């Protein structure tokens, strides 16, 4: 990793928000924007940004809560529950746009987790010129209203034993996307719980390794 550390970004509405940037020593030409889970810019996502940089990605992980909680990283003591209901898809898209503007030109992908997974998928229907959108265990309901508008490839990495969303909802989403002719891939990890990649990595090493490989393959294939 050539460089990494916290940065302060400004969204389109003038809001300052926290982010974490990691730059590769050997760039692949690809960019990644990380959308965290409900905890916001938890230290896990700073470490993940560095991991993407090690794989050649210019990477920025964003925080959601600049408008309601100010700036700074979010450790385990952060009370995200009072802030998460105030986060809107429009604000997330604007914040991601500010993150993209920080990166060099090149194919840019989003990857999100839980709450961020759904928002990452939604970006595939938005105005940002992304090469693809990746999401771990996002809720299908978060993208139900934009399915016809999806224009960019999706990678969906699903926990087979997700406590938040029954498996049949993901299977229904997979069928609906196929009916609409949308470019998507869905992998369901049997038995894996919600947050298996970001909170249960040690117990689900094989699933996490497979998901990482799929991300690298997906981004290589869609980098253009």
Annotate each PLM feature:
Residues 1-224:
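N-terminal cap/leader regions of alpha/beta-hydrolase-fold enzymes
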């Amino acid at each position: 990793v050539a460089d990494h550390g916290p940065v302060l970004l400004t969204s389109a509405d003038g809001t300052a928000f926290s982010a974490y940037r990691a730059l590769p020593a050997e760039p692949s030409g690809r960019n990644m924007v990380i959308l965290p889970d409900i905890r916001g810019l938890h230290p896990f996502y700073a470490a993940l940004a560095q991991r993407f940089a090690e794989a050649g990605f210019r990477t920025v992980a964003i925080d959601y809560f600049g408008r309601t909680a100010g700036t700074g990283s979010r450790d385990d003591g952060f009370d995200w529950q009072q802030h998460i209901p105030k986060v809107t898809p429009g604000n997330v898209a604007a914040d991601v746009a500010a993150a993209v503007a920080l990166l060099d030109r090149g194919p840019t992908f989003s990857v999100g987790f839980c709450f961020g997974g759904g928002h990452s998928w939604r970006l595939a229907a938005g105005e940002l010129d992304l090469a693809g959108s990746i999401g771990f265990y996002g809720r299908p309901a978060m993208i139900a209203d934009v399915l016809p508008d999806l224009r960019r490839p999706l990678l969906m990495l699903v926990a087979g034993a997700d406590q938040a969303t029954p498996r049949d909802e993901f299977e229904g989403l997979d069928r609906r996307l196929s009916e609409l002719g949308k470019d998507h891939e869905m992998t369901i990890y049997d038995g894996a719980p919600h947050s298996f990649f970001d909170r249960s990595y040690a117990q689900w090493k094989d699933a996490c390794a497979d998901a990482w490989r799929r991300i690298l393959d997906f981004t290589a294939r869609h980098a253009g």
